[in-house]
From Swiss-Prot:
GO molecular function: DNA binding; tyrosine-based site-specific recombinase activity
Upper taxonomic lineage: Bacteria, Bacillati, Bacillota, Bacilli, Bacillales
Domain Tyr recombinase stretches: 109-294
Protein name in UniProt: Tyrosine recombinase XerC
Species the sequence originates in: Listeria innocua serovar 6a (strain ATCC BAA-680 / CLIP 11262)
Subcellular location: Cytoplasm
An example Gene Ontology CC term for this record: cytoplasm
Location of the active site: R150, K174, H246, R249, H272, Y281
Amino acid sequence: MTQEGQLEKRFLDYLHSERNYSEHTSTAYENDLSDFRRFLNEQAIIEYQQVTFLDVRIYLTELKQKSFSRTTVARKISSLRSFYTFLLRENVITENPFTYVSHAKNQLRLPKFFYSEEMEALFQVVYEDNETLTLRDRVILEVLYGTGIRVSECAGIMLSDLDTSYQAILIRGKGNKERYVPFGAYAEDAITDYLSGRIELMTRFKKTHDSLLINHYGDPLTTRGIRYCLTKIISKASLTRKIHPHMLRHTFATDLLNNGADMRTVQELLGHASLSSTQIYTHVTKEHLKSTYMKHHPRA
């Protein structure tokens, strides 16, 4: 491994062990470093210590010419700034060339959410029969919409994480932070109806694990597997616009705020470290109110 490769590995290990970053986040940093290393090779720059402010400006220009979104450019620069801050702390460099690099302010991108009639169409799909895998899909949909957890968090649910007496689930979120989220009667009924079929399927394939969600071989259902299940549900519901599974989380937050929930509670339920991450949903509700007004009021 080259010296530069060793520096990258030390940084990624630091993110994982000391900052408790998730594998998904660490992978994003690794990809950003890889892209920057490609750029440096093209510029015949061998060592990270050789990078100057001018080199950074050239790289920033290249990113913009490749039509990356402002959000992507901002993330890449943030990743590299963090990397060079780490190198500075480790006394590998004496000055961070990313310190004074600015980028265009991120555009406000409002989260997309499902409308009530779309949610009804999705639920119709998972309530059409009581086959074990349909019951599992029902659990996925009821839990994701009923709790607002991330798809990756849903994949990590163990039977031991379920507290049926309080109707709550122990969730391990980003940075391995734990939180309890409540779930309602629909999710509870879905889980209860599914568990006997889960046991039968696992017994058939001689599986012995604690994961709540399983695939057709009785193995734990992965994040990718849940996304695949949701994609099939969405397809069967014949929804016309372009949508994605994460919209269930957006819908959960939007529906809570539309029905009077306070911002701090929604923040806790979503597992957001910062209130600013939650406040984006107030823009969604305002836009929805305005759209409804403009569409239906005779003097709009």
